[in-house]
Amino acid sequence: MNTDKISVNPCKSVAKTLVIADYPIGYASGFGETLFNLFTGFPREKLWSAHPGHNVPADGKQHAQSISLLSPSRPRWLPNQLSLAYYPFLKAQQFQAARQAVRILEDTVQRNSIKNILVIPVSPWILSAALTLHKLIPRLNLVLYVMDDWQGHHECHQLPYSRRRRRLLSEVIDRAHVRFAVSREMAAHYEATYGKRWQVVHNGVPKDSLTNGTNGTGAPRQVLLAGDVNEFRFDAVIAFAEAIERHNRRRGQEIEFTVMGEVAEQHRSSLSALQAVRLLSRRSHSECIESMKAADLLYLPLAFAERSARISLYSLPTKLPEYLATGKSVFFHAPRDSAVFRVAERYNLTPRLATIDSEALDTFVDAWAEGKQNGGETIARARSALLEEFDIMRLAARFQAAFV
C-alpha cells in the first residue's frame, strides 16, 4: 500500500478553488493527509491553499499554491501559567491577522478569478476571515468541511464556546452551498441541528491496497500508535500503556508500545515514565506505513473523558483506513457510541474495547499476548469496510464534485 501514489482521474470540469484553513494541503498531520488524498487528481494550477505561514506541507506533498497568512500565537518562551494573562494580546493579534487575511484572500480571488472556497473550521479568526470574504464576494461557491466538531474542539481544549462563535459557525453553515462532515454520526447530528444536507467524506485508501499482513509466528511484542497524543485521546492511551506496563511486570515479558507522533507537553512525562513506552516524533508518511506493517498490533484510541465526548463521538481518525489496509490486527479503543467504534461494530472488526477500566484492559492485554485477541480472522471484514466506506477514488470523486 502506498497512498503517496494514489491515482484518481482528475475532474476536468473543476473550477479554481481556494482552501482557507489552519493547515495546508499535505501538512504532516491527519488534517493535511486527508486533504492531500481527497484532492488527488485536482489540477494544481487550479488550487490555492491559504494558511498561517509557519505551517508548511510535508516534502513532496505540496499539491497547491500556498498563500501565507499571519501566525498569531503565544510566545514559546512565555510560561503556560501566564497564558491567560497574555490572552487579550493574542486576541488583538488575531483581529489584525483576520483583517489582513481578508485583504490577501480578496486579492487572490479577484486576481486569479477563483470560483470556489473551501473552509475548514478550527481557529475562529480564520473562520471569521473566510466568512467576511464570502460576504464581500457572495458569488463564491462556499464549501464547508468539518473535520473536528467545533463545539467539541472548544470543550476539549477548554476554550470559550461563546454565543458569537456559535453564530459564526451557524452563519458559515447557512451560507455554504455544499457541506461535508467527517463521519456519518457527525452528518446526522448536524442535519438535525442545522436543518441542512450534509455529505460524508474522510480519508481513504485505494481499494486494492489491502495486504495479508500476518502477525508472525512468535509471541506478539510490538504495539504501535501512529498519531499524536493530545486531549482527544490521552486518557485512553495512558490507561492502555499502564496495562501493558503491568503485564510486562507480572509476566516478565517485553511488549513495547511505540507512539509515532507528537505528544502534548503536559502528557509527555506520564508516558515517558513507563518502561514499556517508546516515544517517537512524527515520521514521514512512508516510514509510518512501514512501521504499521512491522507491528503486531495497531492501536486506535479516542478519549473517554467528558470534555472530549463530542470529539470522540463524531471524529473518524485519519489512520483508520491505513490501519485496515495493512491487514494487521487493529485494536479499537473508544467510547461505544463513537463513530470509530461503530465502524468496528458494522463490520465486526476485532479486537475492540469501550472502556478504560484497568481490569478490563489487563484482561485484554493478557489475552492478546497469548494470541487470543489477535483479530487475524477479520481480514475479509476489513476488506469489506475498505470497499464500502474507505475507497479513496469514490471519496475523492464525491469531494471534488463540489468544486465545479
Residue locations for each model-derived region?
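Nucleotide-sugar-dependent
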Residues: F232-D235, S286-S291, L298-P321, V330-R342
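Membrane-proximal helix-turn-helix segments that form the acceptor-binding/catalytic region
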Residues: R99, E106, L127-S128, L136, ...
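N-terminal subdomain of nucleotide-sugar transferases
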Residues: N2-L70, I244-H247
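Nucleotide-sugar donor phosphate/pyrophosphate-binding loop at the beta->alpha transition
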Residues: N141-V143, Q151-E171, K207
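A charged, aromatic-enriched C-terminal amphipathic alpha-helix characteristic of glycosyltransferases
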Residues: T355-D362, A369-F403
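Carbohydrate-associated surface elements
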Residues: E185, N203-G204
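Conserved catalytic-core segment of nucleotide-activated headgroup transferases in glycan assembly
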Residues: K207-D208, N215-S270, S281-S286
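A short, active-site helix/loop in glycosyltransferases that binds the activated sugar's phosphate group
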Residues: G53-N55, V172-W198, F341, F399
